[in-house]
Amino acid sequence: IWATVTNFGERPGINGKLQRFADEVYRASNSEYAKYMKGVGILPEGINNNPVTYELLLELVWHKDRVDVDQWIESYVTARYGRITDEIRTAWKMMLKSIYSSEVGYQEGPPENILCARPALELKSVSSWGRLAKKYDRDLYKKAAFLFAKAMPEFNEVRTYRIDLIHFLRQVIANEADSVFYDMITAYQEKKVEKFEQEVSRFLMMIDTENELLAQDPFFRLSTWQQQAKDAGNTAAEKKNNFHNLMMLITYWGEHVTSEDNLHDYAYKEWAGMMNTYYKERWLVYFDYLRALLRGEEAKAPDYFHWEREWVEKNLHMADDAPRMSLEEIVNKVTDR
C-alpha cells in the first residue's frame, strides 16, 4: 500500500504537497514494483483538517494516468462547495502555488502556530517534533485567502465554504503572528519597554481575534469536542474520565512525571475556548515574568509543567466559546475591510 503520514497529533495548520502526492503514486504504480502495489492509503493521526489532501490521496487509486492537480482542483472545489466561481478558482490556484505547493524537505505535519507555543524567548516549534517555519510564499497565500473571503456573500450559506474560510483566515493570523513575536522579543531584549508593551498588546489581540474567528462554527469550538467526549461515556464515571482525558491530551499529554514533558502540546488545538483561555493565559504568565525582569527584579521563570496540569484541573467544565460577533464582522476585521 502506498501511503503517507500527513499529520501527527491531529495538530492544526494547512499543508499538503498535492502535486507531489499525485506524482509519487503515479511513479510507484508505473515502476518495477507496481506488481506489489495493492492500493493507496492515508496514515494521519487525525483527519479533522486538510480535507483536500485526503480527498486527493484516496481518489488517486482510481486514476491510471498522471493527475494534474491544477486541473483536478476544479472538480474538487465544485464538489465541495456545490459550484465554482472565478474568485474561488483563482484563490485555490494561488494556494496550489503557495501553502499546498510541493516544497522540498521533510516535515512532521503542518507548520505550527506560535500563538499556541509554550512561551520562551526563542521558539522553533509548538510541539517537540514540529516546526514553526513556513517555507511557502506567505504573501501569495494571504492574497489567496483574502480573495477566497470575497466570495463570502455568495457562499455564506455553504458550510464547507465557511469552514474553509475560517481555516484559511486562521492560517493568515498564525503566519503574521511570527513577525509580531519577533518584534516583541526584540523590543524586550533591547529594553524598549513601550515598544515591548505595544507588541504584547498586538500579540494578545491576535489571540482574541483568532478565537472569535474560530467561534463562528461549532467545528472549531472546544465545547463541541468536550460534548463528544462526554457522549462517548456510558456512565457518569466514564463521562468524567473521557472529559479529563480530552483536556489532558490537547494540553500536556502525559502523567505527572517530568520525564514525559516532551509530549506537551503534541496534540494542541486551535479552537475557540482554547485560544482565549489556555494559550492566552499561559502567555500572560510569561509576559508578567518578562516585565519583572525589565524592572530589574529577581523573578522565577514560570513552571509550565505544573501550571498546565493545574489549568486542566481548574477547567474541567464546558467551555464558554459562543461567538460574540457575526462571521461577516470578524472576517472584515481579519481582512481589514
Feature-to-residue mapping (PLM):
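Generic detector of short, locally flexible boundary/turn motifs and exposed helical patches
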Residues: W2-F8, F148-A151, Y161
